[in-house]
Every structure is written in structure tokens, then in C-alpha cells.
């Protein structure tokens, strides 16, 4: 069984939520002939504003409300009504509290949402989270969500073992002032998040798609180079798709074949082994 997936390495303009929404809407309309053939389309983390500091939250709220964002995303999803959209992630206010949340929308309906667990930098002063995972289906394919730095927490991905076929990870991963990078000719960050994704996929017996923003990003309080390097890993085949494309507005397409993954599950059974050793109380 094949699931047809697309993604954009979209680079937002800092704190210009309405403008970014307009650009995203235009991208979907421009690529609608291709998107109509896709089952799933993903945008990166913070795709509407970029990361914020606590003292910028008032400006964010003046720009647009969380309810208005949700209404806009629902409307955008109707452009291709048969496609499911993972709407990156954004700061979502619910019950008076913010979280870094990814919302899954299809034809104007929210299917599920997921809040980032591994909060980092200014997120610790703005966001709250929970221990809930999110699962939705595309045909017979079950899909889960994680966000960016969650990759460092194996525990998050263990919750999906035997429950999903694919985990999607919207990300906003840059070079981040890595002082160690100057000592090496290759990208440490790309090696880091690629190795983590491969490990999470193989140890839990599911495929993994990492979708990262790309390009030079600038806000009022920091600048960064978003690394791109989005990739798709499908055990036992390994990485079957990776891009070095630097255009944030390019639609990338991946085909997810479930058959190799089912073969991996049958012969390696790393997901079943986890639960076996857990009952033995050795972990």
C-alpha cells in the first residue's frame, strides 16, 4: 500500500502571521494539481510566526487570535478537500495557556492535535505541554506526531510503538550558534537530527518523516540559518528520501510503501521485543 506525501520546507516571516497564512494559501493553490494527488501534506514547526520570546506574546495576540488561526487553517485545507494537512506547529492558546501545537486538518475539520514535549529556549517561559500523543489515519495507514526537539526523547516515540506506521516531525532546526561547528567541514546539526530519526524509526518499527524549515531566518531577537535537510526513513530500507534543496517554497513528494516496513516488523520485531523486555522488568 502506497501513501503519497508532500511537504514544504517553508520559512516564515517573523511575526507576520497573516502574511504567512496568505503565502501558504498561495502555495497550496499554486501546487493544487499535485497536492490533489497527495494523501498528506506537512509544513514545518513555527510556520506562521517563527519562535517568540515571552515579551512578544502581546504583539502576537494583537496580530491574530488562536481562533482566527484555526479558522484560517480550516479554510485553507478546503482547497484540496481530500488531502490531510499537518499544519506545522504554532503557538496555540487554549484555556488561557499557550502550547507549541501541531494541528491536523482535513476539509475544514480538525482531526487531532499534538503539543511539543521537549520545550526548549524561550518555550519554557511561554508554553505548557502534556503527555498526550496524537494518532490519525490515512486510509489504512496510522500516523503519529512529534515536534522538532522531541527527537531527543525516546520515551515520546515509545508511546507510538505498535500503534502507528509513520511518525511525522515538523521542525524548525537551525545551526543555533553551535560553536563546535567551526571545527568540522560537515553539518553537525544535520548529522545529529538525522541519526536521531533513524534510531527512533528502527527501534520502534515505524517510518519517520522529518520536515524542517530552510533558509536564512531573522527575528527581532535572533538570526539563524535553518538547516532544511528534511528526510524520510523507512525500515529496513533506511533513508529513501533526503533533500538539500534550499527553496522553502518547493513542494517535495515522498511515496511511503508499507510493504517493506511490514517485512521489517516480521523479521526484526523491535517493537514487540520492547514490550517483551518490559514485562521481564529489565527496563
What are these regions (language model features)?
Residues 1-7:
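Extreme N-terminal starter segment of soluble prokaryotic enzymes
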Amino acid at each position: 500500500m502506497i501513501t503519497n506525501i508532500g511537504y514544504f520546507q517553508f520559512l516564515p516571516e517573523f511575526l507576520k502571521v497573516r502574511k504567512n497564512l496568505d503565502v501558504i494559501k498561495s502555495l497550496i493553490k499554486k501546487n493544487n494539481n499535485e497536492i490533489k494527488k497527495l494523501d498528506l501534506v506537512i509544513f514545518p514547526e513555527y510556520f506562521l510566526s517563527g519562535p517568540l520570546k515571552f515579551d512578544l506574546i502581546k504583539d502576537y495576540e494583537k496580530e491574530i487570535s488562536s481562533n482566527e488561526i484555526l479558522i484560517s487553517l480550516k479554510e485553507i485545507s478546503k482547497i484540496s478537500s481530500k488531502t490531510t494537512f499537518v499544519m506545522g506547529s504554532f503557538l496555540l492558546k487554549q484555556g488561557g495557556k499557550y502550547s507549541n501545537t501541531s494541528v491536523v486538518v482535513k476539509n475544514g475539520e480538525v482531526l487531532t492535535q499534538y503539543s511539543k514535549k521537549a520545550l526548549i529556549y524561550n518555550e519554557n517561559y511561554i508554553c505548557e505541554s502534556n503527555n498526550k500523543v496524537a494518532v490519525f489515519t490515512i486510509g489504512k495507514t496510522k500516523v503519529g506526531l512529534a515536534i522538532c526537539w522531541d527527537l531527543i526523547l525516546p520515551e515520546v516515540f515509545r508511546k507510538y510503538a505498535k500503534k502507528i506506521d509513520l511518525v511525522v516531525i515538523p521542525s524548525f532546526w537551525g545551526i543555533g550558534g553551535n560553536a563546535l561547528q567551526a571545527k568540522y567541514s560537515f553539518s553537525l546539526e544535520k548529522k545529529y537530527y538525522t541519526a536521531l530519526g533513524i534510531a527512533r524509526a528502527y527501534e520502534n518499527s515505524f517510518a519517520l518523516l522529518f520536515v524542517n524549515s530552510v533558509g536564512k531566518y531573522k527575528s527581532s531577537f535572533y538570526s539563524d540559518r535553518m538547516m532544511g535537510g528534511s528526510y524520510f526513513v523507512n525500515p529496513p530500507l533506511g533513508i529513501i528520501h533526503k533533500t538539500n534543496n534550499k527553496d522553502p517554497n518547493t513542494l517535495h513528494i515522498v511515496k511511503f510503501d508499507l510493504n517493506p516496513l511490514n517485512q521489517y516488523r516480521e523479521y526484526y520485531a523491535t517493537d514487540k521485543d520492547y514490550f517483551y523486555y518490559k514485562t521481564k522488568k529489565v527496563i
